[in-house]
Amino acid sequence: MRRTVLAGLMAVSLTALAGCGFQLRGLNQPTLAIPELNLNANVSPFSEEVRRALENAGTRISETADIRLNLGDERISENRLTRSDSGSRETEVTLTAPFSVQRESDDAYLLNQQQLEASTTVLLSTDDIYSGEEVRNEAIRQLRRDAATQLIDRLDALETP
């Protein structure tokens, strides 16, 4: 009797967790059909985020790979959305980064002159500059993760021979 009650409670709790969006870490990680890739990029926080995303997607980074990913430098731009002189101001932060994908054997472009773009809106306080800078930096870190995920999605759609 006690065992069936415990099993029933366990089933109800797992259903409740799944219903509220709880997922085990790594369960729905994207996987790429590209087993190996040569990453050609300057060392930067964005290129490191892309490297991490590729490795998490099951792609090994190797200089001898058949496919080369050319990743340009990220560009961060900010656009003020509100015009108040004091207090808080709403700002749109946008990250853009160019990339292309080439075959190593003949340098043919599989994806040429592509652009990654991710943006978010943040509320920056003019009263507390430190917290505003922290909010901005966290937004940029999230944009890097979003752009890396966007790149994984584009590479996943790529048909490679």
Predicted regions and their residues:
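Sec/Tat-exported extracytoplasmic proteins
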Residues: 54-58, 101-105, 150-159
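Exposed loop/turn and edge beta-strand positions of beta-sandwich/beta-sheet ligand-binding modules
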Residues: 33, 65, 95
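C-terminal/domain-edge helix-coil "capping" segments
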Residues: 130-161
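Surface-exposed short loop/turn segments
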Residues: 70-115, 121-137
